[in-house]
Amino acid sequence: MPSSVSWGILLLAGLCCLVPVSLAEDPQGDAAQKTDTSHHDQDHPTFNKITPNLAEFAFSLYRQLAHQSNSTNIFFSPVSIATAFAMLSLGTKADTHDEILEGLNFNLTEIPEAQIHEGFQELLRTLNQPDSQLQLTTGNGLFLSEGLKLVDKFLEDVKKLYHSEAFTVNFGDTEEAKKQINDYVEKGTQGKIVDLVKELDRDTVFALVNYIFFKGKWERPFEVKDTEEEDFHVDQVTTVKVPMMKRLGMFNIQHCKKLSSWVLLMKYLGNATAIFFLPDEGKLQHLENELTHDIITKFLENEDRRSASLHLPKLSITGTYDLKSVLGQLGITKVFSNGADLSGVTEEAPLKLSKAVHKAVLTIDEKGTEAAGAMFLEAIPMSIPPEVKFNKPFVFLMIEQNTKSPLFMGKVVNPTQK
């Protein structure tokens, strides 16, 4: 074995499919046996201690991605990235270890490391609880080079705390190794993410894969027949045509002066909520800089509804990121360098993190209302409702309600940009 080898870690967020679907489409065939898990917040408060950190990490990472380019869509899973790196930190020491946890927004003088990992353990357990109306699954996979001897404690901890599976791979056969990893991801995301790994270094001895898959249906769906082509203003000079979903009804929507934005909360059947932020003219950067965990918490606690005429674009976007540069801006650098200390993973050879790849896919549409037999009637006040059109760049979050954790975050600059 060479004296210096690379460790490829692959981070993946699977499909965020904001799509109403019929329960008959449940691929597991066990929808009737699933149960609601709304009580978990009281039973397992451990994850409450890490949720604010995950939210602030999400906003920090988002701002870095937005800073890199203001003309492209953004979509990523904060939970997926944080889970993978927190799991990796179990095998790191000294500065390498501290940089990772501090980069994930944890202050080690305020929260013991054991509570961080216990928080992730409870978070993953709660996210993977069956729900009759929502498909949400996460997975962690360790792909180990044949003959590589891991430190027993590291292997025990990642299995116990992060519910990780371990697989043996011949990284010398790069094509077969790629296929094994990509097949694992494709299966976990129900075919929505394929060929995640494009290239694999022959010196790779260890790969870590995390995925998250979400599929839900709106609590109050849109009618397909009401969707029409409308203009979306990418910037002051660029306009594109997009299919715009429309509905007149009662919404949890308000105009927030602090954010200079309209804020719309839309629930899914089950325990998830999407939050859309439509900034006032010229206020997108202001919105991006002002988002905090406390503000999001206040919006989630607000149940006030008002009438509005809502226009929301259908879209399908993909976010693919090499996280090395963006995480470097958050202070996570040592693990990618020759000075990395990953001796808690294996003592056989010095390791460093060679690659961190993250991919996420998003679809928003109104399909499935007829298949689900959905019909919803509501009374609308006689006063003229405001017309809120998401026809210019906007920001959104997907929150799991039990844990208040940020499953996904993104920005739509151009809905036609794949």
UniProtKB/Swiss-Prot annotation:
Q: How is it modified after translation?
A: N-glycosylated. Differential glycosylation produces a number of isoforms. N-linked glycan at Asn-107 is alternatively di-antennary, tri-antennary or tetra-antennary. The glycan at Asn-70 is di-antennary with trace amounts of tri-antennary. Glycan at Asn-271 is exclusively di-antennary. Structure of glycans at Asn-70 and Asn-271 is Hex5HexNAc4. The structure of the antennae is Neu5Ac(alpha1-6)Gal(beta1-4)GlcNAc attached to the core structure Man(alpha1-6)[Man(alpha1-3)]Man(beta1-4)GlcNAc(beta1-4)GlcNAc. Some antennae are fucosylated, which forms a Lewis-X determinant.
Which of UniProt's keywords are assigned here? Acute phase, Blood coagulation, Endoplasmic reticulum, Extracellular matrix, Glycoprotein, Hemostasis, Phosphoprotein, Protease inhibitor, Secreted, Serine protease inhibitor, Signal
Q: Which InterPro entries match?
A: Serpin_CS (IPR023795), Serpin_dom (IPR023796), Serpin_fam (IPR000215), Serpin_sf (IPR036186), Serpin_sf_1 (IPR042178), Serpin_sf_2 (IPR042185)
Protein name per its UniProtKB record: Alpha-1-antitrypsin
Task: Spell out where the chain is glycosylated.
Answer: 70, 107, 271
Which CDD domains does this UniProt record tie to the protein? serpinA1_A1AT
Where is the site labelled Reactive bond?
Answer: 382-383
- Result of mutating residue 360 to T? In W-Bethesda
Which residues are tagged with the site (Microbial infection) Cleavage? 352-355
GO CC annotation: collagen-containing extracellular matrix; COPII-coated ER to Golgi transport vesicle; endoplasmic reticulum; endoplasmic reticulum lumen; endoplasmic reticulum-Golgi intermediate compartment membrane; extracellular exosome; extracellular region; extracellular space
The record names the disease as: Alpha-1-antitrypsin deficiency: A disorder whose most common manifestation is emphysema, which becomes evident by the third to fourth decade. A less common manifestation of the deficiency is liver disease, which occurs in children and adults, and may result in cirrhosis and liver failure. Environmental factors, particularly cigarette smoking, greatly increase the risk of emphysema at an earlier age.
Instruction: Please give the subunit comment from the record.
Output: Interacts with CELA2A. Interacts with ERGIC3 and LMAN1/ERGIC53. Interacts with PRSS1/trypsin. Interacts with PRSS1/Trypsin. The variants S and Z interact with CANX and PDIA3.
Result, substituting residue 172 to W: In M2-Obernburg
Entry similarity comment:
Belongs to the serpin family.
Positions where S-cysteinyl cysteine occurs in the chain: 256
Q: What PROSITE patterns would the database entry show?
A: SERPIN
What Pfam family does this protein match (any one)? Serpin
* GO BP term, example: acute-phase response
Domain commentary: The reactive center loop (RCL) extends out from the body of the protein and directs binding to the target protease. The protease cleaves the serpin at the reactive site within the RCL, establishing a covalent linkage between the carboxyl group of the serpin reactive site and the serine hydroxyl of the protease. The resulting inactive serpin-protease complex is highly stable.
Q: In which tissues is it expressed?
A: Ubiquitous. Expressed in leukocytes and plasma.
Q: What is the effect of changing residue 387 to K?
A: In Christchurch
- Tell me what else is known: The aberrant form is found in the plasma of chronic smokers, and persists after smoking is ceased. It can still be found ten years after smoking has ceased.
- Mutagenesis / variant outcome for changing residue 116 to N: In QO-Ludwigshafen
**SMART domains from the UniProt entry:** SERPIN (SM00093)
